[in-house]
């Protein structure tokens, strides 16, 4: 027995050395991890705020190729570039790559959101969200959404000579989310939540240093207060559902509360509801407001595109009597307008990039991606690739006339694979109805140049001020 034990004790170190040598024989990607914790985080954030992040990554690609190592937001990271890399990231098994975000995003939004869940938990929560966000359910929301948009235009656009678009679109999209998804009516509760939410967003992409007066600390504090508000709202919705006969379809939170398992227990935990409500707020508020804002900018700069959108929307408006709401069929006719939205997303994607995490050592492109490292991809790098989209700086909605002609995994405005954004249809409806009323009721001219920065979302110069004139009804 002692001989066997001694032999094993001698063999184990040899075995470990062989494993280490085998792993070290695989090359890490070229590049540098930079300074501890900080790495290249500040450099990338500066480039995003100066609207040079694409050039920042292009320099890396020219220097190191499509695979390189760096350190972002406190973690060693591998940057991957190209449609093949996108496909690898989007379609790899969750046992190989998981959808873990950087620490700052994880801590602000919570660890039970779709951004963090994997496997059966991800499927369960995503399916629950899709019960409300699928087209069949959203058809019943068109009128309610349209009411919010009409009210917004009456309050903030009519009678004005100049407006600043981005803050107004943020107000509009937050009100739509509050009403349709959370059932929060206009008033002090909505106003308090939007203030917390905006403060929360400020530190989501930041170095996770939890010190006083940092953006990250303020973001964490706002997230905690917002989560407490949402827990109170969930309790009220639970009472309405169980004791007052509220409809399960009246808003997203009530819908989630109504989903039961075989033991008649809530399918989604309260923590999952809170974290995913924060995620929906983030995804639905900032991304949609940015998309609509930059659509108006491109329509200002592209007269031929504007005329095509105007004609499409006026043709629909002429079929309506005064006060009539749009229908699902009307939205299905707005094909060119949606192509304009897709081209806007291609040229200025609201989400610059995202992260995954390697759950085991991965060999890709001849290099080792070590277990535990982040994997980073950036959507503009394929969106603006001349080999994929000829004349990529030209605004051309007809690129999306035939979806089959778009190379797989090259347009990633909504992500891809099983983790594609579940709110695509909601974003489409919100965008189309808003653009319909803007182009049929107003004309506008830009008051500032067309530059923008990222912080981390794209922000146009001065928030995109417009000089507007109200049109006569058709």
Name the predicted role of every residue range.
Residues 2-124, 139, 143-154, 353, ...:
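N-terminal membrane-proximal hinge/A-helix region immediately C-terminal to the signal-anchor transmembrane segment
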Residues 3, 7-16, 29-32, 61, ...:
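Cytochrome P450 proximal C-terminal region
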Residues 27-30, 134-140, 242-246, 328-335, ...:
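Conserved, non-catalytic sequence blocks in retroelement Pol enzymes and Pol-derived host proteins
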Residues 287-305, 310, 425-440:
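Cytochrome P450 catalytic-core helices
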């Amino acid at each position: 027995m002692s001989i066997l034990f001694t032999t094993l004790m001698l063999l184990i170190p040899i075995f470990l050395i062989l494993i280490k040598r085998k792993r070290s024989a695989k090359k890490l990607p070229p590049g540098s991890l930079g300074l501890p914790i900080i790495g290249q985080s500040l450099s990338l954030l500066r480039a995003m705020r100066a609207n040079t992040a694409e050039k920042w990554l292009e320099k890396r690609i020219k220097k190191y190729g499509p695979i390189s190592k760096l350190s972002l937001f406190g973690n060693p990271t591998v940057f991957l570039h190209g449609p093949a890399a996108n496909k690898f990231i989007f379609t790899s098994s969750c046992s190989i790559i998981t959808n873990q975000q950087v620490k700052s995003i994880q801590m602000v939004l919570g660890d039970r959101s779709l951004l963090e869940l994997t496997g059966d938990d991800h499927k369960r929560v995503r399916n629950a969200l899709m019960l409300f966000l699928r087209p069949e359910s959203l058809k019943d929301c068109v009128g309610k959404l349209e009411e919010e948009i009409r009210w917004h235009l009456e309050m903030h656009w009519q009678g004005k000579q100049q407006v600043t678009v981005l803050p107004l679109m943020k107000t509009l999209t937050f009100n739509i989310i509050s009403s349709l998804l959370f059932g929060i009516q206009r008033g002090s509760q909505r106003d308090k939540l939007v203030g917390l939410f905006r403060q929360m967003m400020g530190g989501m992409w930041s170095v996770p240093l939890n010190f006083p007066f940092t953006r990250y600390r303020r973001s964490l504090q706002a997230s905690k207060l917002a989560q407490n508000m949402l827990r109170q709202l969930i309790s009220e919705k639970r009472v309405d559902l169980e004791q007052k006969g509220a409809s399960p379809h009246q808003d997203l939170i009530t819908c989630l509360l109504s989903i039961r398992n075989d033991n008649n227990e809530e399918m989604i935990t309260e923590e999952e509801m809170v974290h995913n409500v924060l995620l929906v707020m983030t995804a639905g508020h900032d991304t949609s407001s940015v998309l609509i804002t930059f659509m108006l900018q491109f329509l200002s700069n592209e007269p031929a595109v504007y005329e095509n959108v105007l004609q499409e929307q006026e043709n629909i408006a002429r079929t309506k009597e005064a006060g009539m709401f749009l229908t699902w069929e009307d939205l299905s006719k707005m094909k060119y307008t949606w192509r304009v939205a897709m081209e806007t997303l291609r040229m200025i994607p609201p989400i610059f990039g995202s992260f995954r995490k390697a759950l085991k050592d991965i060999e890709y492109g001849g290099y080792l991606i070590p277990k535990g490292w982040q994997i980073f991809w950036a959507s503009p790098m394929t969106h603006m690739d001349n080999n994929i989209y000829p004349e990529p700086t030209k605004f051309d909605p007809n690129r999306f006339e035939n979806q089959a002609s778009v190379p797989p995994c090259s347009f990633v405005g909504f992500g891809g694979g099983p983790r594609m954004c579940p709110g695509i249809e909601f974003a489409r409806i919100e965008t189309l109805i808003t653009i319909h009323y803007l182009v049929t009721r107003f004309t506008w001219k830009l008051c500032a140049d067309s530059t923008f920065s990222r912080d981390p979302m794209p922000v146009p110069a001065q928030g995109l001020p417009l000089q507007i004139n109200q049109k006569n009804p058709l």
